[in-house]
Amino acid sequence: MKNLIGITLILIITILGIGFSTYYTTVFYGVPVWKEAQPTLFCASDADITSRDKHNIWATHNCVPLDPNPYEVTLANVSIRFNMEENYMVQEMKEDILSLFQQSFKPCVKLTPFCIKMTCTMTNTTNKTLNSATTTLTPTVNLSSIPNYEVYNCSFNQTTEFRDKKKQIYSLFYREDIVKEDGNNNSYYLHNCNTSVITQECDKSTFEPIPIRYCAPAGFALLKCRDQNFTGKGQCSNVSVVHCTHGIYPMIATALHLNGSLEEEETKAYFVNTSVNTPLLVKFNVSINLTCERTGNNTRGQVQIGPGMTFYNIENVVGDTRKAYCSVNATTWYRNLDWAMAAINTTMRARNETVQQTFQWQRDGDPEVTSFWFNCQGEFFYCNLTNWTNTWTANRTNNTHGTLVAPCRLRQIVNHWGIVSKGVYLPPRRGTVKCHSNITGLIMTAEKDNNNSYTPQFSAVVEDYWKVELARYKVVEIQPLSVAPRPGKRPEIKANHTRSRRDVGIGLLFLGFLSAAGSTMGAASIALTAQARGLLSGIVQQQQNLLQAIEAQQHLLQLSVWGIKQLQARMLAVEKYIRDQQLLSLWGCANKLVCHSSVPWNLTWAEDSTKCNHSDAKYYDCIWNNLTWQEWDRLVENSTGTIYSLLEKAQTQQEKNKQELLELDKWSSLWDWFDITQWLWYIKIAIIIVAGLVGLRILMFIVNVVKQVRQGYTPLFSQIPTQAEQDPEQPGGIAGGGGGRDNIRWTPSPAGFFSIVWEDLRNLLIWIYQTFQNFIWILWISLQALKQGIISLAHSLVIVHRTIIVGVRQIIEWSSNTYASLRVLLIQAIDRLANFTGWWTDLIIEGVVYIARGIRNIPRRIRQGLELALN
């Protein structure tokens, strides 16, 4: 019974050992994993290289051509969090559009403020009726309701070419450009005297924006949220991967979202609650046609204010050159405002917020803030849209038809929208200035009142235009390198082993392998080859596209800020790929997609997740069947440094083992043992052995002499003869009488000293022979005992095997009996099997004991042989 229990325990331990085998760290290359990043983006545009428009010139100098075959890959079973307030692309686009704006409206002169006292009187201007040629408006637009700006004729003294003389100059200024001196009715100054430096435009500019796209460099990608209910922040479950954004117009405007993209389904309100200036951005699903126009002619004069510096002003006025208007269809405008308020209510109610059912304008501040400000053909329009919004009410019953007209003014002194500065631009151009745009949304902020209620208020934050356009995008860095536990271990290095190299070819699209991001780790790892090929293919393809685009327009490219960005994007991709390959090489995984290692996996390296827990018996199976690579990467993110270090140490040890193995590889062939280059080595070994034996003999002789000296003997060599001297006083005769003294007898000496040396060498060789003979005899006895043990073990195994077969056959035959008989026979068979197993187990134990005793007696036999040889 005890034997049966022991066998059962052994079987259980064996089964458990098989079930809980060791897992090792395995490196995977080509897994669908990404992390948020902020790389240098580059732009693409469909610019006309033949156009001399400054915006087209800027685009051809700084942007690559559009990809003729843009692609988009949908990620299944993936949910990602988006937040438009944390999108760094908005700030980057603001800086780029600021550069574009300054290049298009390039000021070439910095002027000291024209701050001299002027005596001004109001003058009359000739009014003119404006006719509209658009089909969306009525044939004639009556602008009598739009007040004319007052024009003042101002006189001041100016220094002539002779510094000690002055002359009086007359110039015309708009009332909005001058400010009255306190306490004096006729004394005025220019309005910009509180600015230290102003810039003035040299030539009249035009600005016809074309859409540009922002693209991620190779090794990076753009995630795009396609959820229809996304409103600026939250989880997005419908995600796709793109290389570039959609075309975004570099519009510079406040309050209204012009020429942007439209929502696919219904109007949406984007809102992310922040501490200050909370943006409330509305995007329509149907655009509104907007027409803005200014007609009239004028001539311009100039005032010389210093060497090479000229201040342009109005000399002769024909009509009001700053008077303009914008018009929309009333029905379309009010309908879209209804949709906008409904979208705002939906978004705010989802956040448990209340909204005032009205649209407001800021009452105080710069004119760019209190009015609708935009640029049309190089002219800056300031439009008052209060009558468009104040006439709208929620839940109104009457439908308004016709055309809504808003009064606008053109200004010459403009506040910069991106930085704190001002610019003085040339007076309005001659002829008609007319623009057609599409209103695609509203740019507002949510102002909170004392009742914790929000009021939509039109905003002058220009970058909010790009914020809503880029709200659905996120830049990520693709990280195809990951580690995970697998039961496989890196095999040991063998001699003459050549590592097979697998070429990673170019095949699929770059971002296509991210389509497996929603699959489990086990399912995604099956397609690692295709995914890694897609990764490398995409890097190479994107670099090739970039080079082709640069070569196509290299005669126009200049190494500007954007030119440097293009080079940075290219170098970033190459450096990223080289970095991954260097890590793989350090771990001994170069050119491998799945690389096993000898580093045991530690459970503490991965954090617990809601899907898989460390205490689960099937933890590793849970990882591969339930987690995605993206989820797994987040669990091991904090331990990657430790894992990478251990992988590098393991590879270093592997290289050392390989070096030692290569040193032994020269003995792998039997013929190499007879190589003539090894003979000197053999002779050296023989000399060492002989010297060791001689030294051992000398040492034993010294020990023997010391032993005899301690017993009182004279230390003489055993082979040197000595004469036995006789006492001279002792008679040498025989008994019975005295006789004469006998002569002293000498023992004959050996033939010579070499005989003594020969005798020692003979004894030494005999001792060596006897020692080796004893050793070989002991080894032979041990091998015989081991052979007998193996034979006995094999015989026992055969008997056990036959007995088991017989028992199985008996069990099969007995299975046809009744239940009671089967129970009795089964118990008997188990008892018999237990008794028999105990018998051969004892035999094995006895054999092992016999072998162990033989091995243990080997030193004793050697010692006995040495004693026999030395004595």
From Swiss-Prot:
TM region positions: 685-705
InterPro entries per record? Gp120_core_sf, GP41-like, HIV1_Gp120
Name the coiled-coil region(s): 645-668
Residue span of motif YXXL motif? 713-716
Residue ranges annotated as Extracellular topological domain: 22-684
Modification(s) after translation: Specific enzymatic cleavages in vivo yield mature proteins. Envelope glycoproteins are synthesized as an inactive precursor that is heavily N-glycosylated and processed likely by host cell furin in the Golgi to yield the mature SU and TM proteins. The cleavage site between SU and TM requires the minimal sequence [KR]-X-[KR]-R.
Looking at the keywords, is Transmembrane helix present? yes
Query: Which stretches of sequence are listed as region Fusion peptide?
Result: 502-522
**Any one biological process term the GO annotation gives:** virion attachment to host cell
A Pfam family matched in the record? GP120
Q: Which residues form the signal peptide?
A: 1-21
Q: Where is this region: Immunosuppression?
A: 567-583
Q: Which residues does the annotated region (V3) include?
A: 292-325
V4: annotated segments: 383-408
Q: Which domain of life is it from?
A: Viruses
Cellular compartments per GO CC: host cell endosome membrane; host cell plasma membrane; membrane; viral envelope; virion membrane
Q: Which residues lie on this side of the membrane: Cytoplasmic?
A: 706-871
From the record, give the cysteines joined by S-S bonds: 43-63, 108-202, 115-193, 120-154, 215-244, 225-236, 292-326, 376-435, 383-408
Renumbered to this chain, region (V5) spans 451-458
The free-text function statement in the UniProt record for this protein reads: The surface protein gp120 (SU) attaches the virus to the host lymphoid cell by binding to the primary receptor CD4. This interaction induces a structural rearrangement creating a high affinity binding site for a chemokine coreceptor like CCR5. This peculiar 2 stage receptor-interaction strategy allows gp120 to maintain the highly conserved coreceptor-binding site in a cryptic conformation, protected from neutralizing antibodies. These changes are transmitted to the transmembrane protein gp41 and are thought to activate its fusogenic potential by unmasking its fusion peptide.
Could you tell me what this protein is called? Envelope glycoprotein gp160
According to its UniProt entry, this protein's organism is: Simian immunodeficiency virus (isolate TAN1) (SIV-cpz)
